[in-house]
């Protein structure tokens, strides 16, 4: 287990995104750019559970951590993580007391 850091030169952003997404894994990625709006657009197209922009490894207990593809299943942290450890149950109670025998 370890990070993968491919460093290649590209002329077309669509090719970059296609290459980045052409993997069985999708835990996390990072986009580095002086143009934050463009970086956000690129981040939205990456098939990963987490994308950092101009930084890496920032996280909080409120932020869900979930991998895409073969990078795991389920989620940790945040409301999504809490749901992984719960099992919903519905209990119905009649409105009238006549229903109780």
Regions found by a protein language model. Name each.
Residues 1-101:
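Conserved C-terminal structural/oligomerization subdomain of aldehyde/semialdehyde dehydrogenase
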């Amino acid at each position: 287990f370890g990070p993968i850091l491919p460093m290649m030169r590209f002329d077309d952003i669509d090719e970059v995104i296609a290459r980045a997404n052409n993997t069985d894994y999708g835990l996390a990625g990072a986009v580095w750019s002086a143009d934050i709006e463009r970086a956000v657009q690129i981040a939205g197209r990456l098939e990963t559970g987490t994308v950092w922009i101009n930084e890496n490894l920032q996280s909080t207990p409120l932020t869900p951590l979930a991998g895409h593809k073969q990078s795991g299943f389920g989620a940790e942290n945040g409301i999504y993580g809490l749901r992984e450890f719960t099992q919903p149950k519905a209990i119905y109670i009649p409105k009238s007391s006549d229903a109780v025998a």
